[in-house]
Every structure is written in structure tokens, then in C-alpha cells.
A protein has these predicted regions:
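Conserved glycine-rich Rossmann-like NAD(P)H-binding loop of the short-chain dehydrogenase/reductase
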Residues: 29-41
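Strand-loop microenvironment adjacent to phosphate/nucleotide-handling motifs in alpha/beta enzyme folds
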Residues: 143, 147-342
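Hydrophobic/aromatic anchor residues within beta-strands of the central parallel beta-sheet
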Residues: 56, 96, 159-162
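Conserved Rossmann-fold NAD(P)-dependent oxidoreductase catalytic core, especially the SDR/UDP-sugar
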Residues: 79, 83-139, 143
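Conserved residues in the N-terminal Rossmann fold of short-chain dehydrogenase/reductase
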Residues: 36, 58, 98, 192, ...
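Rossmann-fold scaffold of SDR-type NAD(P)-dependent oxidoreductases
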Residues: 10, 71-80, 121
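N-terminal Rossmann NAD(P)H-binding glycine-rich loop of SDR-like oxidoreductase domains
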Residues: 5-27
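Conserved Rossmann-fold cofactor-binding substructure of NAD(P)-dependent oxidoreductases
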Residues: 55-76
């Protein structure tokens, strides 16, 4: 389905966008356009891969004109551009609105105008029952693409989304932070050891995107099932892998943190389709005439439950270590650390 097609990746220099790019470089895709504001990272990618399929566009999703320029002749869009740090969004919520909500509106408007075939919008577990500015902005982003999907024909532009949990070892995540502190001999700072988080690899996340490209219908949110761990057990697993004795320091929760993350709300779980390794949350396609819905009701919601990092499979320390060792980043860091200790 990707042969001789043009794919645009917004936020293409980030961890997620970069992983998607690498996946499609091995396909028969015609061209991959990397759209981001970071010219240094674009130059790094250009030099690293030296691949004629890669085309680079400097711009910001906040600027509709730069988006429109990059969108010409595009067949597929993977929209990953966002602000990703919860505390930063708490202190600058309007910036989160500009990038995550308005930026998504700009991408979708341009995609519709350019007759793009399919758009995948990247969301996060923080969008389900959100309590922080990043999660609220992502939840609104989901509302934007679902609303857009209601108002256009899927034969013209199919718009859907993916919602993922914590991507292990992605830029700005806790695993690189813990490893840096282990190497520096510093205490591992933990906000709350009993917090749970979903654990997905970048490869898992890319598989979710490919699954959405192949199977999602307009307005859908696709979710991949994932195990979780407590933050305390994750720190312990890394210390055991590195055979380190760093102290663990409890510093208390940061701005906007939740005890557990939710991938599906109770209301979504009642309506979702179980696809084996994935859930498909269909769009609420009702119009504003609720008379029939009020008469018939929906008893499924009262019998449903949310799918969160507390009630999925919670990994043991040994299972976490096995999962960590599947990550090339962790293996490389571990080898370097052991070599330095000889």
C-alpha cells in the first residue's frame, strides 16, 4: 500500500517520528518528507542516512503556510509534532494549545485541501481522563480529528489516530535519565515508586502506526495492548542490570503527574472492538439529535471498566529486565558502562 507513495512525517526528528521514518525507509515508498523546526537534527539525519528518499522541510505546525508547502502531492501523513514534556506544558499551557491543538488543525486542514489519502494523528495515554495541560491538549487534539472525520468523506481523506503508552528510552523519558544517573554515580530520583506506567518499545509503537494505516477507519483511535511496571521496579531493574548500587531518592510527584495512566476510558472500553493485540475505538458518529439515544440508553458503560496501567499485566523486576534488554539503546549503554568499569 506504500509503494511509490509520498509520506509526510510532522515532528519527524523526534524519537517517534524518527522510528517511523526508519521503518518506511526499508519499504518501496517513493519519498519520506521530514517536517520539523529543528534544522540541526534534520542535518544529522540527512548525513546519517544519506538516502535519496528523504526530503527535509523546516517549518512549524503552528504556521499553516509552511505546513501547506510540505503537504503538496503527499499521499499519507503521520502527525507526530507536539510538545512532549508534562511539566513544560503545565508552565506554558498556551504553547501546548498552539502546537498540539492549533497545529493539528493546520495539518488536517492542509491534508484535506491537498486530498491526502490518510492521516494518522499521534496521541497519548495522557489524553484519557486528562489532569495536565499536555493531556488536555492531546484530548482536544483527538476531538479535533474526530470532528474533522465526521465532516468529510473517508474516500477523500481518512483521518484517525493512535494512542500509546510510555515509549521506553524515547527522548526525555525516564530510562535515559536513570541510566545517566547510574553512570554518574548519582541517586536515582523517583517521584513515587508505586506509580505505574505502560511500557512500549519504539518498535511496538511503530507497529501500532502501521496497523492503523492498514486497518483504521475514519475517526478511529487505535490502541495497542501493553504491559506496565511500577516506577520503583523499573529503577530496581536498571540497577540490577548495571550491577550498580546507586541510592534511590524519592522526590515527590511533579506537576501534572498521575498515579496511573489510562489507555482506554470506561466509556471507550464499552464501545471498543478487541482486535487481539489492539483495541479499536470507533468514532462517536451521532449527530446532535439525541432523541433515539436517550430512549434506548447504553447500559454497557455501567458494566465497563477503564484499561489502565494498574489493571493491565504488571511486570516483575525480572520481566522488566528482559524487556529492557530487547532495546538496542539499553544494550549499548550497558556494554559501554561495563567496559568503563574494567
Amino acid at each position: 500500500m506504500f509503494d511509490d507513495k509520498i509520506l509526510l512525517i510532522t515532528g519527524g526528528t523526534g524519537s517517534f517520528g524518527n522510528a517511523v521514518m526508519k521503518q518506511f525507509l526499508d519499504s518501496n515508498i517513493k519519498e519520506i518528507r521530514i517536517f520539523s523546526r529543528d534544522e540541526k537534527k534534520q542535518d544529522d539525519i540527512r548525513k546519517k542516512y544519506n538516502n535519496s528518499k528523504l526530503k527535509f522541510y523546516i517549518g512549524d505546525v503552528r504556521d499553516s503556510q509552511s505546513v501547506e508547502t510540505a503537504m503538496r502531492d503527499v499521499y499519507y501523513v503521520f502527525h507526530a509534532a507536539a510538545l512532549k514534556q508534562v511539566p513544560s506544558c503545565e508552565f506554558f499551557p498556551v504553547e501546548a494549545v498552539k502546537t498540539i491543538i492549533i497545529g493539528t488543525e493546520n495539518v488536517l486542514q492542509s491534508a484535506i485541501h491537498q486530498n491526502v489519502k490518510k492521516v494518522i494523528c499521534l496521541s497519548t495515554d495522557k489524553a484519557a481522563y486528562p489532569i495536565n495541560a499536555m493531556g488536555i491538549s492531546k484530548a482536544m487534539m483527538e476531538k479535533v480529528f474526530v470532528a474533522k472525520s465526521r465532516n468529510i468523506r473517508s474516500e477523500q481523506t481518512l483521518i484517525c489516530g493512535t494512542r500509546y503508552g510510555n515509549v521506553m528510552a524515547s527522548r526525555g523519558s525516564v530510562i535515559p535519565l536513570f541510566i545517566d544517573k547510574i553512570k554518574a554515580g548519582e541517586p536515582l530520583t523517583i517521584t513515587d515508586p508505586d506509580m505505574t506506567r505502560f511500557l512500549m518499545s519504539l518498535e511496538d509503537a511503530v507497529e501500532l502506526v502501521v496497523h492503523a494505516f492498514k486497518h483504521a477507519e475514519t475517526g478511529d483511535i487505535m490502541v495497542q495492548k501493553a504491559p506496565s511496571s511500577t516506577v520503583g521496579d523499573l529503577a530496581t531493574a536498571l540497577l540490577e542490570l548495571f550491577e550498580a548500587d546507586n541510592a534511590i531518592e524519592i522526590i515527590g510527584t511533579r506537576h501534572g503527574e498521575k498515579k496511573a495512566e489510562t489507555l482506554l476510558t470506561r466509556e471507550e472500553y464499552a464501545q471498543c472492538e478487541d482486535m487481539g493485540d489492539y483495541f479499536r475505538v470507533p468514532a462517536d458518529s451521532r449527530d446532535l439529535n439525541y432523541s433515539n439515544y436517550v430512549e434506548t440508553g447504553n447500559e454497557k458503560i455501567t458494566q465497563s471498566y477503564e484499561y489502565n496501567s494498574d489493571n493491565t499485566h504488571i511486570l516483575t523486576v525480572e520481566e522488566i529486565k528482559e524487556k529492557l534488554l530487547t532495546l538496542e539503546y539499553v544494550r549499548n549503554e550497558l556494554n559501554d558502562y561495563k567496559a568503563s568499569m574494567r
